[in-house]
Regions:
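Short amphipathic alpha-helical segments with coiled-coil-like heptad repeat character
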Residues: 258-260, 375, 387
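Structured, charged N-terminal subsegments at the starts of enzyme catalytic cores
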Residues: 309-374
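Extended hydrophobic/Leu-rich segments
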Residues: 1-4, 82, 164, 368, ...
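Short alpha-helix boundary/capping motifs
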Residues: 1, 278-279, 334
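Single conserved hydrophobic/aromatic residue that forms the stacking wall/gate
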Residues: 377-389
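Basic- and aromatic-enriched surface patches that contact anionic nucleotides/nucleic acids
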Residues: 6-44, 48-312, 355-356
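N-terminal amphipathic/basic-hydrophobic helices that include classical n-h-c signal peptides
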Residues: 1-9, 386
């Protein structure tokens, strides 16, 4: 049995690829992010350290991709990679219609690293300048691009890093491929390495000659080129079963460190991401707090289960249940659902029930179903016996 299990696990590992190949696949929307992925949270310093580690030859831990094909592509919402990050103001990814695109990979593990590489090579990172205001403007949150100091390295006394990468304000760099700072040190825009590699008529040698780059600096450029275009730095495991629940369970397992994710958290993320008209996160949060104010300590898990109980033939919490069509149905009937849930707990409280005496909130689901589908929304004390007659 153990040999068989090992074979199944190993069968999913694919041939490693270069960083440049991964970037190209992101460009072509072959790598996308599922709705349950978290927002990008890495700092500029973390991205700089990632590039330093790559230059030192340190490996990137393996990633996990889910091959999405067929009907699964349109059952859920997927997102593009973030390229222009703005601290606090632009941290969310843009959704992408997937009905007319080829099969693609959804990144289950590796989002932060791949996004960091993408921003470093093709995008920008803006964060608030010291003592500036928090409202967004280019002045307060200047756009920065990743640059590589090719004039020197860090000393051991300066930093635990060796290679100097830094996000430089575009007002300083003028967005040039190479700029010289006040200390007469040369900074190379990291994303330029992609163009130099692809242009057969104008590569590193020609660039170095035009910019008076010395031998040691050119060696650093070649090392960067090798890291991006030659070394097979991206190792990944492919999951190709069209079972969203399995993909989510894998995602939960690999993200179990730190703040634990539950299956309910994932369903909540999918519900929020797939709502088109209402702010589902705020609406559900407000409803939960409203019910808690009545003395019943429910969570968003109860609200999600109520969606299934009211509308779905299968009341199990499955990813496949929370597809776009189902979420649209919930969204269109949200006001009635909200009122039914609120009045359910008014009714339970009028019966003398409390959070302490409710052994399971699942027991209240049939009552919710009855109230909702018979449109018995507004409950008052004089009419209470009508519900139990």
């Amino acid at each position: 049995m153990r040999k068989t299990l090992n074979y199944v696990i190993m069968a999913g590992f694919q041939s490693p690829i270069t960083i440049a190949q991964a970037i190209e696949r992101i460009h072509r929307n072959e790598y996308l992010l599922p709705a349950f992925q978290r927002d990008f949270v890495w700092s500029a310093e973390q991205i700089e350290k990632l590039f330093d580690s790559l230059m030192k030859g340190y490996p990137i831990s393996s990633m996990l991709f889910w091959k999405v094909k067929g009907g699964t592509k349109t059952d859920f919402r997927f997102y593009k990679f973030l390229s222009a990050f703005i601290q606090y103001h632009r941290i969310c990814n843009d959704p992408i219609p997937t009905d007319n695109i080829n099969d693609f990979y959804a990144v289950l593990d590796g989002q932060q690293r791949l996004t960091s590489l993408y921003i470093g090579l093709c995008g920008s990172y803006a964060y608030k300048d010291y003592r500036k205001r928090w409202d967004y403007s280019e002045y307060n949150f200047p756009t920065r691009h990743l640059y590589f100091n090719i004039s020197r390295k860090y000393t051991q006394e300066e930093s635990d890093r060796e290679f100097i990468f830094s996000f430089v304000d575009k007002n300083i760099s003028k967005e040039n491929d190479l700029f010289i700072d006040k200390s007469n040190e040369k900074w190379f825009r990291v994303g330029k390495i992609l163009a130099l590699h692809q242009d057969y008529n104008y590569g590193i040698d020609e660039f170095a000659e035009d910019n008076n780059i010395d031998k040691e600096s050119k060696r650093l450029l070649r090392l960067l080129d090798n890291v991006i275009h030659t070394k097979l730095n991206i190792n990944f495991y492919e999951e190709d079963e069209q079972k969203p629940d399995k993909a989510v369970n894998i995602f939960i397992r690999i993200n179990s460190g730190g703040t634990a994710l539950s299956f309910s958290d994932i369903l909540m993320s999918i519900a929020i991401a797939n709502c088109k008209q209402m702010d589902a996160k705020t609406e559900i949060k407000n409803l939960v707090e409203h019910v808690r104010s009545k003395g019943f300590n429910i969570s968003h898990d109860f609200i999600l289960k109520s969606f299934l109980y009211l509308y779905h033939k299968d009341v199990r919490s499955l990813i496949t249940s929370f597809n776009l069509g189902f979420i649209e149905l919930v969204e269109n009937n949200w006001t009635r659902i909200r009122d039914a849930v609120s009045n359910l707990f008014d009714l339970l409280r009028s019966f003398g029930l409390t959070d302490f005496t409710m052994t399971s909130y699942n027991a209240a689901m049939p009552i919710l179903y009855y109230l909702y589908h018979l449109s018995l929304i507004h409950i008052s004390e004089p009419t209470r016996p009508l519900y139990i007659s």
